[in-house]
Amino acid sequence: MRLDSVRLSHYRNYESLELSFSEKTNVLIGENAQGKTNLLEAIYVLALAKSHRTTHDKELIQWDAETARVEGRIHKRRGSHSQEIAISSRGKKAKLNHLEQRRLSDYVGALNIVLFAPEDLHIVKGSPQIRRRFLDMEIGQVSPVYLHELSQYLKVLKQRNALLKQLSMKGGDETFLDVLTEQMITLAVKIVQRRHHFIAQLEKWARPIHEGISRGQEQLVLIYRSDTFSNDLLDVEGMTASYMQKFGKMKTNEIRRGVTLFGPHRDDFEMEVNGRNVQTYGSQGQQRTAALSLKLAEIELIHEEVGEYPLLLLDDVLSELDDHRQTHLLDTMQQKVQTILTTTSVDGIAHETIKQAKLFHVKQGAVILEETSYKEIVGEKTDE
């Protein structure tokens, strides 16, 4: 699949912008704080209906404007379609082919993307919350039903926490708590099973990629972690029984503290390299390799699940990678995916993918198609 064009209206520092992209590689060149990342973020929002940089949608709306809007034209093997996301103080509206989608789970997945940014290193070394968000966003792209189940789970969890807080302060009948617990466990089992499947598929692709980047010196393993059951107990009956047993043990403490103390909203996944936890014991180089391997594996996993390669967004990551890791990433771009990347300069990047790219210059919220060639920009001699 590819993003043919995008149009922004009152999005962050862009009052109005319309761009058409190459089906291969597109490079946004500019100094920092000019709007390069804002443009990539807008494309991310177009695809997933939420930002990867903020949880406050009002930050996406240009100052003094009422509504931010991102529109795109997407081409797939079976045809083209339009997408639109509008963000205002009243909420979000998402449209496919000009028809409003009532549920975001019906919208997400129409445009598949993989974003790789410097902060993605936090997937490896950051908090469990960051890794759970990673799982939820990526699974949601290939499994709309997962987003629906997750939404239902979070609603029940919110109700359950409110009831637990009430019971902790005032006491009362605990019958409704048992009802909410059963509902939560039913949804939790479905969510965890889908997460396990995703982790297994991601590892299948990430292991050989990681081995290649590490020149055969390292083996990457992904492990889902739950404090309720072991990874060899994944059938519905066994997981349900484990959750119910956990609830029995935690009920008194949950009521005392007024909060839910078990469930997939508290789970995590670990990355091990040669048997050692890379989050805790890995060098920065190993952590970068693990993060890059996960992102390149995402590309293959999405292709396997939906039958088309996703759009790849790279936010100033080439400067963060050494030549060896950079080459692995650029080789993938050249062979398979449409890519939109940001950088302050293409100096020192001699890969053929960049030499053949469509170049844009970004300055103060304006984007201009670069008429000069890569060779002229980096000072190489052109053929006469």
Curated annotation (Swiss-Prot):
First-listed, main subcellular location of the protein, grouped into a coarse class: cytoplasm
Highest taxon of source: Bacteria
GO molecular function: ATP binding; single-stranded DNA binding
Segments forming a coiled coil: none
The keyword ATP-binding appears for this protein: yes
Pfam family, one: SMC_N
Localization per record: Cytoplasm
GO BP, one annotated term: DNA replication
GO cellular component term, pick one: cytoplasm
Alphabetical list of Gene3D superfamilies matching this protein: P-loop containing nucleotide triphosphate hydrolases (3.40.50.300), RecF/RecN/SMC, N-terminal domain (1.20.1050.90)
Keyword terms of this UniProt record: ATP-binding, Cytoplasm, DNA damage, DNA repair, DNA replication, DNA-binding, Nucleotide-binding, SOS response
Annotated binding of ATP, by residue: 30-37
PROSITE patterns, alphabetized: RECF_1 (PS00617), RECF_2 (PS00618)
Keyword Cytoplasm: yes
Purpose: The RecF protein is involved in DNA metabolism; it is required for DNA replication and normal SOS inducibility. RecF binds preferentially to single-stranded, linear DNA. It also seems to bind ATP.
Similarity-based family: Belongs to the RecF family.
The protein's name: DNA replication and repair protein RecF
